[in-house]
């Protein structure tokens, strides 16, 4: 049995797996120090798969809290290969899990964002709910992802955009792989990636497919002092969707404000989700190339909208949310139509192989 004395020397409350798991099953919330301890044991390879699975399922059974996830985020960073990227940076990512198999909206949006002049540090992995993951598509577009952390940071300066491949920056997560794979269900580990960008990005647009978790994710960003837009489509997509309305949690100055957003308020007509459907990485990469070449249609609308969400997180404005997003969409459209976004990708490919 693993046990630890909490900070402050409280020897009457030694932490152990039975104590934590019983607490979860009794419906008691854990402290940030509790969850930080548990994940530290896990990431040092000192927990069994049964303990890991019990912890993950117990948290979901009870319902994760902002404080519990904040403790996990703290430990994730302690075990991560973090990098320093000077200046204001932004990330755009989805948690996955919506099962819609759409094209890679956040990946295309990241490139367009960089085309507007924003410095983008994207954190991602293999496929979760898209037909292919960010890394799969970027490889098909020619971006070299086999870079050292130091080189990843340098690429951000040279190209205005870079990609942190989660498995390379959070290697200690290998210890949860077996338990996660055998469980086959959503757990808190599905949400930690978007919360732990290795560059410690302070602005992000994050899509969350799970309704209960979206405001929790927003709360974690607020607790950490970030400027963020967290959203969930009322169709279940982990995007600012164009097939229905969305719920948006605007995080600013440590506070969270919830709003409803209708894409028709920015001139986008609703489309069926099939209009955003993707396929394998080669297909999705071709969609990205056509977008950057100026192709109009539902995919472009979705990319402009999500790019605007990230711009709003990076440079928060005043006034109605729809007005702020409309202004961001205009900037994103100019980045595409001027060729700036396409040139960003070309530069990214070149410097990633230098």
Swiss-Prot record:
Binding annotation for Mg(2+) 2: 238-239
Annotated residues for binding of Mg(2+) 1: 106, 239
GO molecular function, one term: magnesium ion binding
Catalytic reaction equation(s): N-(5-phospho-beta-D-ribosyl)anthranilate + diphosphate = 5-phospho-alpha-D-ribose 1-diphosphate + anthranilate
Sites where the protein binds 5-phospho-alpha-D-ribose 1-diphosphate: 94, 97-98, 102, 104-107, 122-130, 134
Pathway: Amino-acid biosynthesis; L-tryptophan biosynthesis; L-tryptophan from chorismate: step 2/5
Cofactor or coenzyme needed: Mg(2+)
BP GO annotations: L-tryptophan biosynthetic process
Gene3D superfamilies xrefs: Nucleoside phosphorylase/phosphoribosyltransferase catalytic domain, Transferase, Pyrimidine Nucleoside Phosphorylase, Chain C
Family: Belongs to the anthranilate phosphoribosyltransferase family.
Entries under PANTHER family matching the protein: ANTHRANILATE PHOSPHORIBOSYLTRANSFERASE
UniProt name for this protein: Anthranilate phosphoribosyltransferase 1
Organism: Streptomyces coelicolor (strain ATCC BAA-471 / A3(2) / M145)
High-level lineage: Bacteria, Bacillati, Actinomycetota, Actinomycetes, Kitasatosporales
GN (gene name): trpD1
């Amino acid at each position: 049995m693993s046990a630890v004395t909490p900070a402050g020397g409280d020897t009457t409350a030694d932490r152990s797996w039975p104590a934590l798991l019983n607490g979860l099953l009794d419906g008691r919330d854990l402290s940030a120090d509790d969850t930080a301890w548990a994940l530290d044991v896990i990431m040092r390879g000192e927990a069994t798969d049964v303990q890991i699975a019990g912890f993950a399922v117990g948290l979901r059974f009870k319902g994760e809290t902002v404080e519990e996830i904040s403790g996990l985020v703290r430990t994730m960073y302690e075990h991560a290969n973090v990098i320093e990227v000077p200046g204001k940076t932004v990330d755009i990512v989805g948690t996955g899990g919506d099962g819609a198999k759409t094209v890679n909206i956040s990946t295309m949006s990241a490139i367009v964002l960089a085309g507007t002049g924003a410095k983008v540090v994207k954190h991602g992995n293999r496929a979760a709910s898209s037909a292919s993951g960010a890394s799969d598509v970027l490889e098909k577009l020619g971006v070299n992802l086999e870079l050292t952390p130091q080189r990843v940071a340098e690429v951000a300066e040279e190209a205005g955009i870079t990609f942190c491949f989660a498995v390379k920056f959070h290697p200690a997560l290998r210890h949860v792989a077996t338990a996660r794979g055998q469980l086959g269900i959503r757990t808190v580990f599905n949400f930690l990636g978007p919360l732990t960008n290795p560059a410690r990005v302070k602005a992000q647009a994050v899509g969350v497919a799970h309704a209960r978790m979206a405001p929790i994710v927003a709360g974690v960003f607020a607790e950490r002092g970030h400027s963020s837009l967290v959203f969930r489509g009322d169709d279940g997509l982990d995007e600012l969707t164009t097939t229905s309305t969305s719920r948006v949690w605007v995080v600013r100055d440590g506070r969270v404000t919830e709003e409803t957003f209708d894409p028709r308020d920015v001139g986008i007509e609703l489309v069926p989700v099939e209009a955003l459907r993707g396929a394998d990485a080669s297909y999705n990469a071709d969609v990205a190339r056509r977008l950057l070449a100026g192709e109009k249609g539902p995919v472009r609308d979705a990319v402009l909208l999500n790019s605007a969400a990230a711009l709003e997180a990076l440079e928060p404005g005043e006034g109605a949310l729809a007005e702020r997003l409309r202004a961001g969409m205009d900037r994103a459209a100019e980045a595409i139509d001027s060729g700036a976004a396409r040139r960003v990708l070309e530069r990214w490919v070149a410097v990633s192989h230098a």
